């Protein structure tokens, strides 16, 4: 059995009892970064063999995963934060397990997407998850314009050092876009701000501390 386990996005208390039980019961844990996952395992007194499996190495770890499953071992996969499958490795492992006829079981948990949507103040009928945009170039701007033109709200992930650039890019598409920004969600310095692109740019550029951390951005065209 391959378990795909949702883990916290910041606060280590944000994990289900079921997820903890699964991590305690499996034979081995494939982790995006073992240095990150060891903190979670230590918090819940879980001592298991871990194997690093990230976006670069995932394809090479498929054979190892299948070897474990062939022996009848149970395996869990966890990303650094949140529920695997969105902007994280894991899909290649899942595809291989399905292809070879092994059972795959999702263990739901928190994600940046459902966290930001839960505090969305705009009345959007649908919300798309885009995740990380291309780092630079015309492709990045075109993607923002394409997403905005569709009319659905959409969610982006961005690092602090590119946040101001992103807000300028969104303003180039629409000065009136409605934006909800979650900074360091569930962590010590968690905060949420709403406004139009240039209003938010002014707020976040007012202090270097404000652009530190990880950002989740919901962009809306809602009229309400």
Curated annotation (Swiss-Prot):
Pfam families the UniProt entry points to: TP_methylase
Primary localization: cytoplasm
Enzyme superclass (EC): transferase
Entry's EC annotation: 2.1.1.198
InterPro entries: 4pyrrol_Mease, 4pyrrol_Methylase_sf, 4pyrrole_Mease_sub1, 4pyrrole_Mease_sub2, rRNA_ssu_MeTfrase_I, SAM_MeTrfase_RsmI_CS
Membership in a protein family: Belongs to the methyltransferase superfamily. RsmI family.
Protein name: Ribosomal RNA small subunit methyltransferase I
Gene source species: Borrelia garinii subsp. bavariensis (strain ATCC BAA-2496 / DSM 23469 / PBi) (Borreliella bavariensis)
